[in-house]
Amino acid sequence: MSQVQEQHISESQLQYGNGSLMSTVPADLSQSVVDGNGNGSSEDIEATNGSGDGGGLQEQAEAQGEMEDEAYDEAALGSFVPIEKLQVNGITMADVKKLRESGLHTAEAVAYAPRKDLLEIKGISEAKADKLLNEAARLVPMGFVTAADFHMRRSELICLTTGSKNLDTLLGGGVETGSITELFGEFRTGKSQLCHTLAVTCQIPLDIGGGEGKCLYIDTEGTFRPVRLVSIAQRFGLDPDDALNNVAYARAYNADHQLRLLDAAAQMMSESRFSLIVVDSVMALYRTDFSGRGELSARQMHLAKFMRALQRLADQFGVAVVVTNQVVAQVDGGMAFNPDPKKPIGGNIMAHSSTTRLGFKKGKGCQRLCKVVDSPCLPEAECVFAIYEDGVGDPREEDE
């Protein structure tokens, strides 16, 4: 893990982490904060350095200064700018409150929002909307960079381990943060089980494939089982109670509710460090809330809005987004030429919204097959993994 990555993660946890996640802060940083005022804020770090009591923290501050002098910025590493930073040049606290009430909790959220969305907020005039966009653009880098700089930023991305070395190798290290990974397949192919495993591995330290953050889990089918997290947490050396407390769970009951939950998710992620969002499954409610060809256009528009909101959360907070998807059988004449007539639902909207698409199939016993169907950087390949009591892993000798 690079020095830049270490600095970013440690600083994010000190500023936004709470509860048991503070235990993931390196021992020297955690101790320094406790010896200060005990609340882990960035102001305490500066105060400690100023008083001459923060030897290790002084080095951290110098490292931060060096990092700021380099080309890569914090936004590229998944950090975010608090929306309060917009309170300049005529933008008041009342304006910030209006933005928060409308679901915009970071400067990035304002910068990425279309102008017409800002104008729909009560009390935001055209002049104020322009001022908000200009100030957000000043804080959030949105211009051109060289391919070399972008390559450097991507080299700092974190990948979350799946619990299976075979699957991690297939994915180039694990599930990539900052993008959407879609898992599709029939029932009992391991999609939800992989989501349960990732809900735990996202909490483990970076040096063993984790993200040192919490998980936000949206369940649309009622398949989430906390008891599965207990055995998986024990496998990875985590306290089961801490692991459960670091998973924020919500059951979605309709497509509109599913979309509204992302507003609550944005607020939670602006207050604490998260490294993973799970939606299991993304299309289940759309299949029942929208029926027939007459509502197909409305369904796809709603789905596009939901997937765009997910991608914005990935962009703002640098989290990995994992969604599961169901399949449908093709009943047209193409079945005769296709050995596997099942395809993921959601159409082109779903296909274009997902960065990486993984197809899952059943195997022998507890074994499952995963295939890379679509990816901007991974070759088409497949691997075998297995599902055990302690989560997803590699097949064992007795199962082969």
UniProtKB/Swiss-Prot annotation:
Q: Name one GO biological process term.
A: nucleotide-excision repair
Matching InterPro entries, A to Z? AAA+_ATPase (IPR003593), DNA_recomb/repair_Rad51 (IPR011941), DNA_recomb/repair_Rad51_C (IPR013632), DNA_recomb/repair_RecA-like (IPR016467), DNA_repair_Rad51/TF_NusA_a-hlx (IPR010995), P-loop_NTPase (IPR027417), RecA_ATP-bd (IPR020588), RecA_monomer-monomer_interface (IPR020587)
Entries under Pfam families matching the protein: HHH_5 (PF14520), Rad51 (PF08423)
Q: Which GO terms describe its cellular component?
A: condensed nuclear chromosome; mitochondrial chromosome; mitochondrial matrix; nuclear chromosome
Q: Which residues take part in binding ATP?
A: 185-192
What GO molecular function annotation could you give as one example from this UniProt entry?
identical protein binding
Q: Where is the composition biased (Polar residues)?
A: 1-34
SMART domains (UniProt xref): AAA
Region annotated Disordered sits at 1-69
Top-level taxon in the UniProt lineage = Eukaryota
Q: How does it assemble?
A: Part of a repair/recombination complex that includes RAD51, RAD52 and RAD54. Interacts with HED1, RDH54 and SAW1.
Q: What else is known?
A: Present with 6960 molecules/cell in log phase SD medium.
Family (UniProt): Belongs to the RecA family. RAD51 subfamily.
According to its UniProt entry, the function of this protein is described as: Required both for recombination and for the repair of DNA damage caused by X-rays. Its function may be modulated by interaction with other repair proteins. RAD52 interacts directly with RAD51, via its C-terminus. Forms a nucleoprotein filament with DNA as an early intermediate in recombination.
> What is the name of the protein in this document?
DNA repair protein RAD51
- What is the species listed in this Swiss-Prot or TrEMBL entry? Saccharomyces cerevisiae (strain ATCC 204508 / S288c)
Record gene name: RAD51
